[in-house]
């Protein structure tokens, strides 16, 4: 397994729409394993393949309590139904150090393939619903800052660009924690 570079906003590759996975094979499973290792190393709870520069519809998540690991791999995930609305603070490994309130569906039903290529469906609410929506947004080229006002987006972009100049964050991969 390998730790991959995490792309940092405003890297244009974060805006690409990921291609569906045609076949779940050893390469896709290796990608998922590398993404999990990268996510754990960065102390995140979710990571989309587009965040590591791979244009495939693959997401990894782990919402377990600290210390316990319950990795989840979603291949070709899609949301089937949304209900309600809830606002909560979100962060992103591609926008390190920034957290903002974002409104999302309170409950969702989604489907995906597992790491063996088997289809499955699940209903989710709370943190899991937020995380699934956030990561699928990445696969569609959308970031949580897109839900913010233009003023807030510009402020975050300027601050991140300053961190890049200071060498604390490297566009194309993280070199430090913001």
Curated annotation (Swiss-Prot):
Pfam families: Pep_deformylase. GO terms for biological process: co-translational protein modification; translation. It catalyses: N-terminal N-formyl-L-methionyl-[peptide] + H2O = N-terminal L-methionyl-[peptide] + formate. The keyword Cytoplasm does not apply. The active site is at 135. Its EC number is 3.5.1.88. Its cofactor is Fe(2+). Fe cation binds at residues 92, 134, 138. The keyword Iron applies. Keywords: Hydrolase, Iron, Metal-binding, Protein biosynthesis. One of its GO terms (molecular function) is peptide deformylase activity. InterPro entries: Peptide_deformylase (IPR023635), Peptide_deformylase_sf (IPR036821). Binds 1 Fe(2+) ion. It comes from the Bacteria. HAMAP family: Pep_deformylase. Removes the formyl group from the N-terminal Met of newly synthesized proteins. Requires at least a dipeptide for an efficient rate of reaction. N-terminal L-methionine is a prerequisite for activity but the enzyme has broad specificity at other positions. Belongs to the polypeptide deformylase family. This is Peptide deformylase. The lineage of its organism: Bacteria, Pseudomonadati, Pseudomonadota, Gammaproteobacteria, Chromatiales.
């Amino acid at each position: 397994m390998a730790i991959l570079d995490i792309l940092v906003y405003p890297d244009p590759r974060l805006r690409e729409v990921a291609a569906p996975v045609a076949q779940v094979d050893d390469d896709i499973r290796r990608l998922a394993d590398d993404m999990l290792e990268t996510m754990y190393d960065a102390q995140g709870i979710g990571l989309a393949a587009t965040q590591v520069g791979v244009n495939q519809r693959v997401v990894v998540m782990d919402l377990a309590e600290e210390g316990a690991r319950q990795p989840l791999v979603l291949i070709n995930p899609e949301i089937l139904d949304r209900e309600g609305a809830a606002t909560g603070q979100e962060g992103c490994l591609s926008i390190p150090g920034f957290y903002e309130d974002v409104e999302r569906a309170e409950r969702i039903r989604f489907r995906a393939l597992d790491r063996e290529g088997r289809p499955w469906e699940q209903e989710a609410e709370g943190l899991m619903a937020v995380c699934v929506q956030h990561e699928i947004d990445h696969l569609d080229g959308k970031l949580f800052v897109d839900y913010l006002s233009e003023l807030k987006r510009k402020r975050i972009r300027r601050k991140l660009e300053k961190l890049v100049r200071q060498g604390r964050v490297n566009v194309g991969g993280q070199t430090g924690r913001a």
